[in-house]
Amino acid sequence: IIGGDNYPPFNYTDENGNPAGIDVELAKEAFSRMGYKPVFVNIDWENKKNLVEQGKIDCIWACFSVTGRENDYHWAGPYMLSHEVVAVNNSSKIYKLSDLKNKVIAVQSTTKPEELFLKQTDPKIPKVKQVYSMENRELIYTSLGKGYVDAIAAHEISIRQYMSDYEAKYRILDEDILETGIGVAFAKNDQRGIEKELSKTLKAMVKDGSAKKILKKYVSDAEKYLEVSSLEK
């Protein structure tokens, strides 16, 4: 049982009511190679750690960043690179991260951008006036579109997907706030070792081109997102 939340293009429900997206397709292929049939469930993202630790789900697989959470879970991957970025309205005078000083930003709750802006541990991220943490990711985009906030921060692929789906006129800042790997999280108390086999399977899928084939359906420069070796530098 795979837990995730609605996060296009990684994880969403298609027009026929079926699970779809990058992570869904990767999971189906990887687990079928391993002899499992995945079942996808939508979870309360804020409660993900409890759900996996209690065994209500077997793993968390939905564009989940490894960085800073390395010791919280047993990880498979990282299988993809992701850039956490800041987006503003086209007309905004914000062009670089330092321009965010004393501005209002919206993020999805329990995500890396929320942590980065609230904890202020990275010197390149200025102190903002206010951080709005929203459980529903759609609300961050609505807040920006209506001008309630000055900026939003999220995974670049997800922002670009929203811009494409809704013809939203946002501008993504050149400086990212974090380059991170995305992985599949299993509970620390899970002794089955599935994550090790899954890591090997995902690597094999990158090697044989099947991961790239899946990504190409959703993003234009698939190779860029599979260069996870750059995280080891």
Residue ranges and their predicted role:
Residues V24, V39-N50, Q130-T142, K146, ...:
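Short helix-initiation/N-cap motifs at beta->coil->alpha
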Residues Y12-E15, A27-Y36, P113-M134, Q161-E167, ...:
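Ligand-binding cleft/hinge of the Venus flytrap
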Residues G21-R33, I94, S98-V104, S109-K112, ...:
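Extended ligand-binding regions for polar small-molecule ligands
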Residues N47-N50, C63-D72, L116-K119, S143-E179:
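A ligand-binding cleft/hinge motif common to bilobed small-molecule-binding domains
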